[in-house]
């Protein structure tokens, strides 16, 4: 049994070395360039991450379709009902700035594929719901108007 674990451990170490050596650097960024690029995080670390979309309608969790094994037909009701009449990114941006935030990130498309923005690649998007607007565009414009970074 001891020999089995030694062999298994050796195989694991060998394979992990191959995995590490197979990683490719995707940029030619120097350490100094990375430090400069990430300096904003040190200076502007207070921000807002908004995780919001079609999955908000069932009011349980963002993985509702997957975890509750909803069919496309069952989930369609949320697409049909989607009309965020209280969506007010101008107010959100003003409040974020007043709170001292420096940036905001919006989940523009979640795992189920619903887009809060207009896209030529799908009809599964906010512009095809009752709201008929590009919600990401409104978000970006509102936050930039307040001088906040957007992601």
What are the functions of these language-model segments?
Residues 22-151:
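Mature catalytic domains of secreted/periplasmic carbohydrate-active enzymes
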């Amino acid at each position: 049994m001891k020999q089995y674990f030694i062999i298994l451990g050796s195989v694991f170490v060998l394979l992990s070395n191959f995995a590490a050596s197979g990683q490719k650097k995707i940029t030619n960024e120097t350490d100094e360039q990375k430090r400069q690029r990430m300096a904003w995080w040190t200076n502007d670390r207070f921000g807002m991450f908004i995780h919001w979309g079609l999955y908000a309608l069932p009011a349980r969790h963002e993985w509702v379709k997957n975890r509750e094994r909803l069919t496309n037909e069952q989930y369609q009701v949320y697409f049909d009902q989607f009309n965020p009449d209280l969506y007010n990114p101008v107010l959100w941006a003003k409040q974020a700035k007043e709170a001292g935030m420096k940036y905001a990130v919006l989940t523009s498309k979640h795992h189920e594929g619903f887009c809060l923005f207009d896209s030529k690649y799908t009809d599964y998007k906010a512009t095809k719901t009752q709201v008929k607007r590009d919600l990401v565009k409104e978000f970006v414009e509102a936050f930039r108007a307040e001088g906040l970074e957007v992601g």
